[in-house]
Design a protein with these regions (language model features):
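Short, Lys/Arg-enriched alpha-helical microdomains
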Residues: 177-194
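Domain-level detector for trafficking modules
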Residues: 3-4, 15-17, 75-165, 174-179
């Protein structure tokens, strides 16, 4: 059991060490070694460029012999990702997982999937149908979703407004959000001293 925890911590530390050079970053949820959030940048020259996508990562007790459970928290228009639940259809998160793979590998594979959708093996049939029948409309829709849901500045401004509507100053809201990984609930607890 300790060797599994050591592996998980090593993977986490490796991602932290290289987060500036990576287009993927991770953090633990409530210091839970088995529950992380990941952020991946929308790949350049794709309809996802400019977006920041948050991934929920649950690491099972059987890790690394079983894959991490991942889903998109950020809404995304993609044939292999549910536009409703964020569930992902990716072989390495299912039957192609091997213990030699890492969470970083899985996150980079998600980024690659954003570059090269596989509409023949969809998670979201409606999106896949649009992708195959009208790629121009698909790209326009995906870009709209990036602007609406994966735009970090726009989302940050919404969070600031939510806190200022509660009576906090804009600076208090910014500081609290920055200290709490932009989690509004934690920022509120921080601001009220809970």
């Amino acid at each position: 059991m300790d060797s599994i925890k050591n592996r998980i911590m090593k993977e986490y530390e490796d991602l932290q060490k290289h987060k500036e050079e990576n287009t993927v970053t991770v953090w633990m949820v409530d210091n839970n070694i088995r529950h992380w959030k990941g952020k991946i940048k929308g790949p350049i020259d794709t309809c996802y460029q400019g977006g920041i996508f948050v991934i929920d990562i649950l690491i099972p007790d059987e890790y690394p012999f079983k894959p991490p459970k991942m889903k998109f928290d950020t809404k995304i228009w993609h044939p292999n990702i549910s536009s409703v639940t964020g569930a992902i259809c990716l072989d390495i998160l299912k039957n192609e997982w091997t213990p030699a793979l890492t969470i970083r590998t899985a996150l980079i594979s998600l980024q690659a999937l954003m570059c090269e959708p596989v509409p023949d093996d969809p998670q979201d049939a409606v999106v896949a149908k649009q992708y195959m029948s009208d790629i121009k409309l698909f790209n326009e829709t995906a870009k709209h979703w990036v602007e609406e849901y994966a735009n970090p500045e726009r989302n940050f401004q919404k969070k600031i407004k939510e806190l200022t509507d509660m009576g906090f100053t804009e600076q208090q809201a910014r500081d609290a959000l920055e200290k709490n990984n932009e989690d509004v609930e934690k920022a509120i607890n921080y601001l009220v001293g809970a």
